[in-house]
Design a protein with these regions (language model features):
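Residues forming the flavin
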Residues: 1-237
């Protein structure tokens, strides 16, 4: 049967294209690859099998076995298939999703957005950084920001344990002397045009901040690595 992949980006690979660190492919290919290299292996396999690919194509709706999509070359398209596979990944939780109080200046980024700015677009997002969340993307960005010349003041985690892999704790935090604050969270963001201060406080067993435990960091950037939300809007009809 014929297979068609619809991709809204200009290239296949998704988030892997901005994950330029190594560590991919050990189980599947028995060698260590970067994210783009890992994605390229699967793209090559798909092309070898004759899979049709349409890039820069936006899917607008999925109704039964019918897909409505569009791009600049073909315009609006109505496609039908025997089976439809949704592989849309997820998006990051934002500041609003986790209700961080305080001012709303520039300098607050999700970790994945900062990663794309640095690794793909070539923009440095800040010089003095606090990271909320200790998932793997947060840990990897702590290292990446340090390698690009920024000072990572703290990695802050709400839970009493780190959510990232042990190897990332060692390679991304310990190796660069970046402090990890467990059972802490961000309680305030200050700044007029740009982030100027971030307040961090310890939390109790109820995950609520404990008065009197506040630490204020003078910084210009807050990165959020606070979880992912499935990109499933197309399934709601």
């Amino acid at each position: 049967d014929d297979i068609l992949i619809l991709e809204r980006d200009k290239e296949l690979g998704g988030i892997l294209n901005q994950c330029i660190h190594n560590g991919f492919g050990l189980h599947t290919f028995k060698e260590e690859l970067t994210g783009p290299e890992y994605a390229a292996r699967f793209v090559q396999n798909a092309e070898t099998l004759g899979v049709e690919i349409m890039l820069d194509t936006m899917v607008l709706a999925v109704e039964g076995h019918r897909v409505t999509a569009c791009n600049t070359e073909d315009g609006l398209m109505m496609l039908e298939g025997k089976a439809i596979v949704l592989a849309m990944g997820c998006r990051e939780r934002t500041r609003g999703a986790v209700a961080i109080p305080g001012d709303r200046p520039s300098g607050v980024f999700t970790a994945g957005t900062a990663q794309r700015y640095i690794n793909i677009e070539g923009y440095m997002v800040g010089k003095r950084v606090v990271i909320l969340g200790s998932g793997d993307i947060g840990l990897i960005m702590a290292r990446r920001m340090t390698l690009e010349g920024a000072k990572v003041l703290a990695c802050v985690e709400l839970m009493p344990y780190c959510n990232g892999l042990n190897r990332n704790i060692v390679q991304c935090l310990n190796d660069y002397d970046i402090p990890l604050y467990l059972s802490h969270t961000v309680t305030n963001v200050e700044g007029l045009h740009r982030v100027e201060k971030v307040t961090v406080a310890e939390v109790g067993a109820d995950r609520k901040p404990i008065p009197g435990t506040e630490i204020v960091f003078d910084c210009d950037t807050l990165l959020l690595s606070v979880g992912l939300i499935p990109e499933n809007e197309l399934t709601r009809k």
